[in-house]
């Protein structure tokens, strides 16, 4: 399991979460391996210049770039700021199990109307599909509301 965190969160994550997870076993009977990747600007590709006044990390793709050294098999991204329940985990597990060797990808998607908040705006990846019903692109869309 890879946690993508700010460097100053390492001790807290190890004590609150990492130690507990490391005590669990995988389906194969191995201990859960816990790794920490730091979301910082050192992972930003050379072709992109980070604005000098930028402090906040970029989004999910930036986080994945930071974790790339730890990812060697099918994986799932779970954002800490949204939780969609146990069924989402069951669904993605079933789909990942089918993809183990195919090199393909999958995702759990939701109708946009079910993911916006009545308490302000949200940012969501809005999925666009092609004529065959296959995912064509995901567009990060800001300030969405009901």
PLM regions and their residue ranges:
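Conserved core of the sugar-phosphate nucleotidyltransferase
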Residues: 86-146
